[in-house]
């Protein structure tokens, strides 16, 4: 990825101060999604390391991970698996509790979403502390997935999420980093 593209990509992400609470700068990718060239280039860059590889499924974390994950699944000719918050999927599910900054939450996936041994890329818009992604990887592994990578448009490196995922033995692909949180 060229430095020019990285700068263009960063510029296409809206910063919303003090959301969802004071002191937080929310990185809003809806502006990137609304720019066809930026969206296409972001997907192409996220997919690039796995072009030509056998990827069976792309798993996207609710909600922006669905948008990015669907586009990536299309690019690599794979299926798509939604990972949702508890109670949102209609069929029999497997769930995983994961740590939040203050407390815990649960995510779920359909019990039959993955055939054991399938190669899966996990996708979301942003990685911060890595709690949700860590829970998603554990959940996918619980149902037999081989998680071959985790892809995020944005990394907040000060919060350590990407390092946490790498420590789980999963390669991480991010496109841009923003300081702070």
Curated annotation (Swiss-Prot):
CDD domains: PRTases_typeI (cd06223)
Catalytic reaction equation(s): AMP + diphosphate = 5-phospho-alpha-D-ribose 1-diphosphate + adenine
Superkingdom of origin: Bacteria
Gene Ontology biological-process entries: adenine salvage; AMP salvage; purine ribonucleoside salvage
UniProt pathway: Purine metabolism; AMP biosynthesis via salvage pathway; AMP from adenine: step 1/1
Top enzyme class: transferase
Entry-linked Gene3D superfamilies: 3.40.50.2020
GO cellular component annotations of the record: cytoplasm
EC number: 2.4.2.7
UniProt keyword list: Cytoplasm, Glycosyltransferase, Purine salvage, Transferase
Intracellular or extracellular location(s): Cytoplasm
Family designation: Belongs to the purine/pyrimidine phosphoribosyltransferase family.
Entry function: Catalyzes a salvage reaction resulting in the formation of AMP, that is energically less costly than de novo synthesis.
Oligomer status and interactors: Homodimer.
Protein's UniProt name: Adenine phosphoribosyltransferase
């Amino acid at each position: 990825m060229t430095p020019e593209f990285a700068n263009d990509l960063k510029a296409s992400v809206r910063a919303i101060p003090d959301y969802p609470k004071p002191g937080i700068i929310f990185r809003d990718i809806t502006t990137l999604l609304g720019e066809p060239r930026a969206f296409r280039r972001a997907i192409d860059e996220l997919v690039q390391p796995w072009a030509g590889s056998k990827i069976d499924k792309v798993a996207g974390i609710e909600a922006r991970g669905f948008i990015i994950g669907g586009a990536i699944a299309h690019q690599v000719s794979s299926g798509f698996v939604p990972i949702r918050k508890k109670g949102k999927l209609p069929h029999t599910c497997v769930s995983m509790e994961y740590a939040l900054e203050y407390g815990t939450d649960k995510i779920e996936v359909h019990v039959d979403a993955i055939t054991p041994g399938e190669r899966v890329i996990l996708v979301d818009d942003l990685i911060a502390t890595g709690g949700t992604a860590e829970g998603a990887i554990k959940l996918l592994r619980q149902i037999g997935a081989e998680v071959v990578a985790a892809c995020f448009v944005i990394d907040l490196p000060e919060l350590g999420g990407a390092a946490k995922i790498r420590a789980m033995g999963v390669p991480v692909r991010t496109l841009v980093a923003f300081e702070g949180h």
